[in-house]
Amino acid sequence: MKVGVIGAGTMGQGIAKAFAQVDGYEVALCDIKQEWAEGGKDKIAKGYARLVAKEKMTQEKVDGILAKITPGLKEDLCKDCDLIVEAAFEDMNVKKTTFAELDKIAKPECIFASNTSSLSITEIGNGLTRPMIGMHFFNPADRMKLVEVIAGVNTPAETVEAIKKIAVEIGKTPVQVNEAAGFVVNRILIPMINEAAFIKMEGVSDIAGIDAAMKRGANHPMGPLELGDFIGLDICLAIMDVLYNETGDSKYRACPLIRKMVRGGNLGAKSGKGFYIYNADRTKTPVDAQ
């Protein structure tokens, strides 16, 4: 099966690895510029090189995986794909435009799936000549076991079953979800991160204290502010805004502190600063501990 992955950023790279690591799958890793797609594959290669250096993978295995990932432009590589998974920026207009372009070039039997973390599958697919489905991976996509399979209003049952089968084939656990804002995981998880930001903003505790409390008291592997940085505070904010706008419920109001941080470019680990400062030696320091 040939899988097109649209977006060669962090999620796209992980999704590409998730498929390429399994026999029977090849991947077209696409972005809007050739060099961006090639850069995505380069980052994948560097990640595997670290595993080889630690003797966790063989070079032969890595070479085989990388040979199955072809970087390029969607108009060149996606014409013969059996499945296309979009992992572009979390913006409705971007996603609708991307799929409208793909609809003109992909073969009729190709399945369209979006990795959106919160947006309406029905709206993304509106106007297309084929069904749309949500196939929501979690970061890092090659290692996290869950895939949320989201059915929109017009998603046929056979498409849902096909995606669930593919998810199992690549070693994932599919959970079927009927379309709703935030789906399952993010409707629970992102408000928790948002509430942790309110606790920080109100001075109830400091960053290290909030994260330590949830790790030690709730047995979470990462504290909520640390996790927000890992996900990306811009992504967290976008999801909170979707939850609030879709439901109208004030409990989903985004914390002003997160909005202010995003406006200032402090997005978390990917920008080098969020609730923590990320140092060159891969250590991190809470911003309120300086």
What residue ranges belong to the model's regions?
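NAD(P)+-binding Rossmann beta1-loop-alpha1 motif at the extreme N-terminus of oxidoreductases
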Residues: 1-50, 54
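Rossmann-fold dinucleotide-binding core
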Residues: 111-178, 183-187
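Acidic/polar active-site rim loop that often engages polyanionic ligands
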Residues: 25, 79, 140-150, 221-222, ...
